[in-house]
């Protein structure tokens, strides 16, 4: 996976689910942690105006295209097509394939 910029916003080009799984595995094995961010047109526009939001977006270790604004932006700016990644499903599959375990925290005790 290669990192590109759309109007200054970091966004990975995701060529395949396999590439994403490899990236996720490497991220987990490295034990560095981090968070993902779904990049869409609204977030790209807010990025230019809100410095606190910009800092959050810049800190993402896995900014992925999510929505037509990001995917069309990559096509127009770089002439590449990025797949639409079902990130939760991909993380579950990667965890299963690599015998990783994880903990999910819900918003309330009832959903834990």
Identify the residue ranges that each predicted region occupies:
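N-terminal nucleotide/polyanion-binding subdomain common to many enzyme families
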Residues: 1-88
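Conserved beta-alpha
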Residues: 70-112
């Amino acid at each position: 996976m290669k990192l590109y910029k759309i109007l200054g916003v970091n966004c990975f080009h995701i060529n395949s689910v396999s590439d994403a799984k490899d990236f996720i595995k490497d991220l987990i094995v490295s034990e560095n942690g981090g968070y993902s961010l779904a990049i869409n047109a609204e977030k790209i526009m807010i990025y230019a105006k809100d410095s606190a939001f910009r800092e959050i977006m810049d800190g993402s270790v896995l900014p992925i295209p999510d929505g037509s604004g990001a995917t069309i932006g990559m096509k127009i700016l770089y002439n590449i097509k990025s797949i639409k990644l079902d990130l939760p499903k991909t993380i579950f599959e990667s965890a299963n394939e690599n015998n990783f375990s994880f903990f999910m925290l819900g918003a309330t005790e009832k959903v834990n």
